[in-house]
């Protein structure tokens, strides 16, 4: 960790805890700042706050008292989930107190260069692929951080100059950066999202675009050339632009030509050898290849990762091939768009498992994507709604109680060569606490099925 002096004896307010807040407070304390932590959760139910108090950090829990800002703070580090229209943030900005997010602190203390990845879709998968490619090239050369579950500042604290930090970044995090500068920035794509947090689409796009705002001519920006909006924005960057495209033969950057993954006119390997299915994953692959080639990863090392990487858990994750059937876990598909993307990725017949929390959708938008679906197995609050669309498509529909009950039915109704896909198109909360719990239930049920059949 860089021993920076800029925060020594500064009064710093960390607003909102969770893992990133705990990490920011702890590091600021080590840097000699006078740290106060404020979190809405009551102290008695807040083990994180209790741990910080034991370190000698001032802790205020149970509410966000706006008068706290009258205590002369010189900096606010906010949890990325707290919006800028929060009264505490509005008052801090009115008082001209700088407001940053924890990734800004991570950059300031990091000895390791950062590969920053943002976008509406594909951030986690792309970040993970890049991480694996760099570590295949040189063991322990990449550390995983950011919105992926490891606080950026905690990772940066222990990173060394011969490593890279592969950092997933949300628009929430990027809105609060001032000096943050990745050596390589990646923007996978931009669609409508988080308009409950951002005032409008323009603010959302600008938050994503912040990832490159401090880059210079020695840095790189890997960007989706299939999106005209992003292509036009590259006129504003000082970084070296590396495009990627799933639809165009670019001749530079990464793209597909004659069934091959290409980079700057060089064949990296065959597209058909990639384990991850789908056009959306092809975007993630091409962005990752651009980063890997820029950092000296060999074609053999790149293809080793692409031929073996099963996907991030619960995101069109390949589970197992058994009895000629391939099982995929896409429990993260908590909306219709995500299930559409998953279905587009398969050419073989699909047995689809879908259903969950009813948010008032009709699911008619799934109809054009049911061309390869041979059987539909539905469960949860939306079983009847999704089943109705399946019947309109002329698909055989089976109604079951839950994901666990769906798995043996899917096996019975499938044949060798089929895809068995959990892609619910709904949130899990009607039956499962999280989409992870639902995905794990699916994978456990597959294991039990295999054990039962092979007895």
Curated annotation (Swiss-Prot):
Principal location: cytoplasm
Residues engaged in binding ATP: 119-125
Pathway annotation: Cell wall biogenesis; peptidoglycan biosynthesis
Catalysed reactions, semicolon-separated: UDP-N-acetyl-alpha-D-muramoyl-L-alanine + D-glutamate + ATP = UDP-N-acetyl-alpha-D-muramoyl-L-alanyl-D-glutamate + ADP + phosphate + H(+)
UniProt-listed InterPro entries: Folylpolyglutamate_synth_CS (IPR018109), Mur-like_cat_sf (IPR036565), Mur_ligase_C (IPR004101), Mur_ligase_C_dom_sf (IPR036615), Mur_ligase_cen (IPR013221), MurD (IPR005762)
GO MF term list: ATP binding; tetrahydrofolylpolyglutamate synthase activity; UDP-N-acetylmuramoylalanine-D-glutamate ligase activity
Intracellular or extracellular location(s): Cytoplasm
Enzyme Commission number: 6.3.2.9
Pfam families: Mur_ligase_C, Mur_ligase_M, MurD-like_N
SUPFAM superfamilies named in the record: MurCD N-terminal domain (SSF51984), MurD-like peptide ligases, catalytic domain (SSF53623), MurD-like peptide ligases, peptide-binding domain (SSF53244)
Annotated keywords: ATP-binding, Cell cycle, Cell division, Cell shape, Cell wall biogenesis/degradation, Cytoplasm, Ligase, Nucleotide-binding, Peptidoglycan synthesis
GO biological process annotation, one example: peptidoglycan biosynthetic process
GO cellular component, one term: cytoplasm
Function comment: Cell wall formation. Catalyzes the addition of glutamate to the nucleotide precursor UDP-N-acetylmuramoyl-L-alanine (UMA).
Family of the protein in this entry: Belongs to the MurCDEF family.
NCBIfam families: murD
Entry protein name: UDP-N-acetylmuramoylalanine--D-glutamate ligase
Organism: Listeria monocytogenes serovar 1/2a (strain ATCC BAA-679 / EGD-e)
Lineage: Bacteria, Bacillati, Bacillota, Bacilli, Bacillales
